[in-house]
């Protein structure tokens, strides 16, 4: 028996605008008993069919929409169509930017709620973040194999958000071969080694690709401090852009070793690069106190806010770290600063940077804005898909 969800009166407006989420408070009743991730029919209170989606009984987002087309079944062919649509956009980007690594599926923004797929050459790395994504895993794998016969598929669903969906964390091979320790991708002429199994996220921060390329124009003949460097992404582009000297700072020695390897495979001059194992907050205070200055500071920290109750603390963290960065910049220097916290909108982040300037006793001019790379598109009906924001700031 098909399970049907009926929305409360007046709670269908967002769905009619094609927003893909149905919250628990917006539901009037459920006819039938749905299993975790089961496909359900969604109706307005008056009985009008609106959408077909996946049921998440333990989440505040009680259902996520697969389709607004009543005649569209959620089967292998559905996933094949979505993959082909997504690949069409990425083909344009891959040719334009010389990409062998990119985000193929950006969840709701590509019409597949809770599903993220990053492609590193012939390795497809999946993060399944919702009950519906988990329930349709086999169909998704079948569709990937049909679209990419020579693919290897690896799951990196080792993220805490799955707990909210009633799911355990999972990793492992779904099809093909186990990824090697290093898969080398290329973007904008830069080679990058990716550890799919143990790296952050699915192995690399693909969403910052456009920002990395745009950073090149700020660094020629400059001294650069790359904070939270991970495997050296921004630092590699700084060397590409002609930086005089680049310090990559991170707490992970393994990440720094990979950053150095990345510099080597790109044949960059290692005498211009330094790889420093350090706590960035402590390092910035040391530089401030001993008078060390830089021409450019790149500030790309991890997500400080995972939930709304962490936002206040995150604001303090972002302000403190940007204040410290401003204090170690030469007059006329450039701060490239970013936030990947989706809960923090661009306006709030700009205010935090402005407040940091006041505390640092520096005059700051915002001269450029940054967003997530084009393979992380923003669907017009899903503003929550916008999460990465950044600024280039001239610090006087």
Swiss-Prot record:
Residues 2-81 form the PUA domain. It comes from the Bacteria. The keyword Transcription does not apply. Keywords: Cytoplasm, Methyltransferase, RNA-binding, rRNA processing, S-adenosyl-L-methionine, Transferase. PROSITE patterns: PUA (PS50890). Its EC number is 2.1.1.191. One of its GO terms (cellular component) is cytoplasm. Pfam families: Methyltrans_SAM, PUA_3. It is an enzyme of class 2 (transferase). It catalyses: cytidine(1962) in 23S rRNA + S-adenosyl-L-methionine = 5-methylcytidine(1962) in 23S rRNA + S-adenosyl-L-homocysteine + H(+). Belongs to the methyltransferase superfamily. RlmI family. This is Ribosomal RNA large subunit methyltransferase I. It comes from Aliivibrio fischeri (strain ATCC 700601 / ES114). The gene is rlmI.
């Amino acid at each position: 028996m098909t399970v049907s969800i009926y929305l409360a009166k007046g709670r269908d407006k967002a769905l009619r605008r094609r927003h893909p989420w149905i919250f628990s408070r917006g539901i009037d009743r459920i006819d039938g008993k749905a299993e975790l991730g089961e496909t359900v029919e969604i109706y307005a209170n008056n009985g009008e069919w609106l959408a077909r989606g996946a049921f998440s009984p333990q989440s505040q987002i009680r259902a996520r929409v697969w389709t607004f087309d009543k005649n569209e079944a959620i089967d292998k062919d559905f996933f094949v169509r979505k993959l082909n649509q997504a690949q069409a956009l990425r083909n344009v980007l891959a040719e334009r930017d010389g990409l062998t690594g990119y985000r193929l599926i950006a969840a709701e923004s590509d019409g597949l709620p809770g599903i993220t797929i990053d492609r590193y050459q012939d390795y497809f790395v999946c993060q399944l973040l919702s009950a519906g994504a988990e329930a349709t895993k086999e169909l998704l794998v079948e569709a990937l194999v049909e679209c990419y016969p020579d693919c290897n598929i690896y799951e990196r669903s080792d993220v805490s958000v799955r707990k909210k969906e009633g799911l355990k964390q999972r990793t492992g091979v779904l099809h093909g071969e186990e990824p090697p320790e290093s898969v080398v991708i290329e973007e904008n002429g830069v080679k990058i080694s990716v550890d799919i199994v143990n790296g952050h996220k699915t192995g690399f921060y693909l969403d910052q690709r456009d920002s990395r390329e745009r950073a090149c124009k700020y660094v020629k003949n400059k001294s650069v401090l790359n904070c939270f460097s991970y495997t050296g992404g921004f630092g590699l582009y700084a060397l590409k852009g002609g930086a005089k000297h680049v310090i990559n700072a991170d707490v992970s020695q393994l990440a720094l070793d990979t950053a150095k390897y990345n510099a080597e495979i790109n044949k960059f001059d290692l005498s211009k690069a330094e790889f420093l194992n350090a706590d960035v907050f402590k390092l910035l205070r040391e530089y401030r106190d001993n008078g060390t200055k830089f021409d450019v500071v790149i500030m790309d920290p991890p997500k400080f806010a995972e939930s709304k109750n962490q936002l206040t603390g995150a604001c303090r963290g972002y302000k403190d770290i940007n204040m410290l960065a401003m204090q170690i910049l030469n007059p006329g220097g450039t701060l490239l600063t970013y936030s990947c916290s989706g809960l923090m909108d661009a306006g709030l982040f700009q205010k935090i940077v402005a407040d940091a300037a006041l505390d640092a006793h520096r005059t700051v001019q915002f001269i450029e804005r940054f967003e997530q790379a084009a393979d992380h598109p923003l669907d017009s009906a899903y503003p929550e898909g916008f999460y990465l924001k950044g600024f280039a700031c001239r610090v006087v």
